[in-house]
């Protein structure tokens, strides 16, 4: 057993928007409490994936146990459970918040409250956490602590009269933060005598030990060698290794209610130890699991194909390995006439999709083509059957469809007032429905829109950032399905449909998208020896077309003067050859053409 009583344990997390200094603050807390020796310290200690360091975001959750001697002379154990700040991972955030009793709300003193911060604060309030506001980066010349403190009071409704002013980089105010955690965050409930219940808030795959599970003991106690059951996946394991994270793993014999630790038990895949699952004893299980477990469902889908067909087995292996570590990733084999063999993959959101692609290319040295992202459509067929379609090429023909429904999301954008107009215009052009507008302070405004998810998955976020010079932030949640007049837009190159370019669009926008698409392809597909028509069609009706003229040799060059019939003969011979070539020739569609779909601007 670790010797600290439950009353002297504090479990807390840090809530902050991307770039507001959360990881740096975590570094300082580790340093001040001597958890990490000075020589081992490096920037962003808890972000241990290269990609996290590079993008400056936290993807996987980290946890760290710190021993702190408070001003009252007592020794406390502080467990920091770090959370990802990005909207795609909000389920993981909610689980890690459920493992805490308190949270530090870190806000950049020069920027103020952002949308994702707000979303996570609401999650924290739902979990009844004690929230301690902290102003970070107060040493910046552009810091406006009074304005931002007023904004936090206004927007979040927290009392900021004694807000902690800190600078994680300069190390200002770190002791105040530690004291505030001890004084204000309530200790965990003392339920050591009850049957074991523990919450899994993260897990990762280790090549030697199998899955390593990070968990927080809610009730009871757990010892090394215990046989435990995971309630959602209903599997039983014997704990081989039990320990605490200070941030490196340190083995212990037992953990009791209120403590945070890890265990390894030869679990084969992360999917068997899902985030949010409840751990209990196999022989004396708890009556009911901890609340709040849900399966993470993918929302965005796209096809991944290797540029070189020989890399297909490598892509398969890479996806299998990533899946061990990322339970939210789903994939199934797919074949395409244009691209060959590949996989249809499902992701939590756009950032998740980009990260998976980048990890595949970086860690497994693969060259990939990705098709345009799509969402799950619900189609009711004429036989009253409801099917879910995540790939445009699988949409049933128009005669067999009664209605098509698409997922809608509620988007909350927080922006400086000057950019409200351009953002409203952006949402309007994406079939958005205006719902509400709130003025937080003189300069900051929240816009709430309902939008089809399909309109957001392509480049909405990039547009939002570029139209507001990077100042706006957004947060979204799924609100359900709605019926819309959606059609499948096919792209035909030389008379053949290219399934990787097919897309599902709103009927009113189909012409503009088709028009933009064919003119873009005309620029990107190289000229061939024969004329290549490019068409956009809905069913059998062509709505837009372009032609790429043939490359042709001047066959009359050697006829100086001479008879017209001689020239006609040569031209007809050439035309005949071109005709034959067109019948048997294939058109080479380059990789850029598939990428162009993502960056279309159908105006």
UniProtKB/Swiss-Prot annotation:
Single biological process term from Gene Ontology: translation
Membrane-topology descriptor: Peripheral membrane protein
Listed InterPro entries: EF-4 (IPR006297), EFG_III/V (IPR035647), EFG_V-like (IPR000640), EFTu-like_2 (IPR004161), G_TR_CS (IPR031157), GUFP (IPR027518), LepA_C_sf (IPR038363), LepA_CTD (IPR013842)
Name recorded for this polypeptide: Elongation factor 4
Keyword Protein biosynthesis: yes
All residue ranges annotated as the tr-type G domain in the record: 7-189
Localization: Cell inner membrane
Keywords: Cell inner membrane, Cell membrane, GTP-binding, Hydrolase, Membrane, Nucleotide-binding, Protein biosynthesis
Record's GO cellular component terms: plasma membrane
Chemical reaction(s) catalysed: GTP + H2O = GDP + phosphate + H(+)
Record-listed E.C. numbers: 3.6.5.n1
Coiled-coil residues: none
Family under the similarity heading: Belongs to the TRAFAC class translation factor GTPase superfamily. Classic translation factor GTPase family. LepA subfamily.
UniProt KW Metal-binding keyword: no
Name of the gene: lepA
Protein's organism: Synechocystis sp. (strain ATCC 27184 / PCC 6803 / Kazusa)
Domain of life: Bacteria
Main location: membrane
Residues where GTP binds: 19-24, 136-139
NCBIfam families reported for this sequence: lepA, small_GTP
Function: Required for accurate and efficient protein synthesis under certain stress conditions. May act as a fidelity factor of the translation reaction, by catalyzing a one-codon backward translocation of tRNAs on improperly translocated ribosomes. Back-translocation proceeds from a post-translocation (POST) complex to a pre-translocation (PRE) complex, thus giving elongation factor G a second chance to translocate the tRNAs correctly. Binds to ribosomes in a GTP-dependent manner.
GO terms of molecular function: GTP binding; GTPase activity; ribosome binding
Class of enzymatic activity (EC top level): hydrolase
């Amino acid at each position: 057993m670790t010797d600290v009583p439950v009353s002297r344990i504090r479990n807390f997390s840090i809530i902050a928007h991307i770039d507001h200094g959360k990881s740096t603050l975590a570094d300082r807390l580790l340093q001040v409490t001597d958890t990490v020796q000075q020589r081992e310290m490096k920037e962003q200690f808890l972000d241990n994936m290269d990609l996290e360091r590079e993008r400056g975001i936290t993807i996987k959750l980290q946890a760290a146990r710190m021993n702190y001697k408070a001003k009252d002379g007592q020794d406390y154990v502080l467990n920091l459970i770090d959370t990802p700040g990005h909207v795609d991972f909000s389920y993981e955030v909610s689980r890690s918040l459920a493992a805490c009793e308190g949270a530090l709300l870190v806000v950049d003193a020069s920027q103020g409250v952002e949308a994702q911060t707000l979303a996570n604060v609401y999650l924290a309030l739902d979990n009844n956490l004690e929230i301690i506001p902290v102003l970070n980066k107060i040493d910046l010349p552009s810091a406006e602590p009074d304005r931002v403190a007023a904004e936090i009071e206004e927007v979040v409704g927290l009392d900021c009269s004694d807000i902690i002013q800190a600078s994680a980089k300069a190390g200002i105010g770190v002791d105040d933060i530690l004291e505030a955690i001890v004084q204000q965050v309530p200790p965990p409930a003392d339920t050591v005598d009850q049957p074991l219940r523990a919450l899994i808030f993260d897990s990762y795959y280790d090549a030697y030990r199998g899955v390593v599970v990070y968990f927080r003991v809610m009730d009871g106690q757990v010892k090394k060698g215990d046989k435990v059951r995971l309630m959602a996946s209903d599997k039983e394991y014997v704990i081989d290794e039990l320990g605490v994270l200070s941030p490196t793993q340190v083995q212990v014999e037992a953990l009791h209610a209120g403590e945070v630790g890890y265990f390894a038990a030869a679990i084969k895949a992360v999917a068997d130890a899902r985030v949010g699952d409840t751990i209990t004893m196999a022989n004396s299980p708890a009556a009911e699991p901890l609340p709040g477990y849900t399966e993470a469902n993918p929302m965005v889908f796209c096809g991944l194909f290797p540029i070189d067909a020989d890399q297909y087995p490598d892509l398969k292996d890479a996806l299998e390995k990533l899946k061990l570590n990322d339970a939210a990733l789903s994939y199934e084999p797919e074949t395409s006439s244009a691209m060959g063999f590949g996989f249809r993959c499902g992701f939590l959101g756009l950032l998740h999709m980009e990260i998976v692609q980048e990890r595949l290319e970086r860690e497994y040295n693969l060259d990939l083509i990705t098709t345009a992202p799509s969402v799950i459509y619900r189609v009711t067929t004429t036989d009253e059957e409801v099917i879910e379609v995540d790939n445009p090429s699988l949409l049933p023909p128009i005669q067999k469809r009664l209605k098509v429904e698409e997922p809608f999301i509620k988007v909350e954008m927080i922006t400086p007032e000057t950019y409200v107009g351009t953002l409203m215009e952006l949402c309007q052009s994406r079939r958005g429905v205006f719902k509400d507008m709130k003025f937080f302070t003189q300069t900051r405004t929240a816009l709430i829109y309902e939008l089809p998810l399909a309109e957001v998955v392509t480049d909405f976020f990039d547009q939002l950032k570029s139209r507001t010079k990077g100042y706006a932030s957004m947060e979204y949640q799924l609100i359900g399905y709605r019926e819309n007049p959606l059609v499948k837009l096919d792209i035909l190159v030389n008379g053949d449909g290219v399934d990787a370019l097919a897309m599902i669009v709103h009927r009113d926008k189909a012409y503009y998208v088709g028009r933009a698409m064919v003119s873009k392809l005309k620029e990107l597909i190289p000229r061939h020896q024969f004329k290549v028509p490019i068409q956009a069609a809905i069913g059998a009706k062509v709505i837009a077309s372009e032609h790429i003229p043939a490359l042709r040799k001047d066959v009359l060059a050697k006829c100086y003067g001479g008879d017209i019939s001689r020239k006609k003969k040569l031209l007809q011979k050439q035309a005949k050859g071109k005709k034959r070539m067109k019948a048997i020739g294939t058109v080479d569609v380059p990789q850029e053409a598939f990428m162009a779909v993502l960056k279309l601007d159908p105006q």
